[in-house]
């Protein structure tokens, strides 16, 4: 999706890329995140304009990640179908970035169900995949019990979690010194997420700079 000019990749192009990654892992699980663009991960201008994505005053708080996908349901289902098709070639997990509302989670799961039905109708093979939620918005960390009822696993996205918890743009050099992974508020949120996941018997992983 990034570092390319013109149209975004179609379903078959995505499928080939995902399948290659799955096959290269020789049976080990592959976690594929749905489109996570916006803020520090922008698309090129032509692709953005194609999707009617206007320049935002504060992209970190705007139409990005799962919000962007849900605003473009046809594009989103296209990616979901490609990921599901790749699951026929090995162990695949699907990860949803930047969830903040249970309503977004429900919309996402509905989109996955629709994509599955489209593949069934087309006679294309796939297997059921585990679906996980990225916890990178404080709101998500604080409603973990509700999200854990809907998802199979969670992944702590520490870079954005720190940014949103401390109200700091990590790309802004004037406040970069305040970006603190060891801030008590950040650690309390992380502790809560891990505890709730353990209580629910769900796996939790960590990504971002804190993961090392």
Label each region the model flagged.
Residues 1-212:
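Conserved alpha/beta-domain cores
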């Amino acid at each position: 999706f990034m570092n390319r000019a013109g149209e975004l990749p179609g379903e078959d192009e995505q499928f080939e890329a995902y399948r290659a990654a799955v096959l290269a892992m020789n049976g080990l699980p592959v976690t594929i995140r749905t489109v996570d663009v916006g803020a520090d991960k922008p698309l090129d201008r032509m692709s953005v304009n194609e999707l009617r994505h206007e320049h935002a005053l504060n992209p970190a708080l705007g139409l990005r990640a799962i919000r962007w996908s849900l605003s473009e349901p046809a594009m989103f289902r296209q990616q979901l179908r490609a990921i599901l098709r790749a699951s026929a070639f090995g162990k695949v997990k699907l990860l949803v970035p930047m969830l903040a509302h249970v309503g977004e989670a429900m919309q996402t799961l509905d989109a996955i169900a629709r994509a599955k039905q489209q593949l069934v109708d087309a006679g294309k093979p796939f297997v059921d995949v585990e679906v996980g939620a990225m916890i990178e918005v404080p709101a998500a960390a604080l409603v973990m019990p509700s999200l854990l009822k809907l998802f199979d696993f969670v992944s702590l996205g520490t870079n954005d979690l720190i940014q949103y918890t401390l109200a700091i743009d990590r790309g802004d050099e004037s406040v970069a010194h305040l970006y603190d992974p060891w801030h008590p508020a950040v650690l309390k949120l992380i502790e809560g997420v891990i505890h709730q996941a353990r209580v629910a018997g769900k796996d939790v992983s960590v990504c971002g700079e804190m993961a090392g």
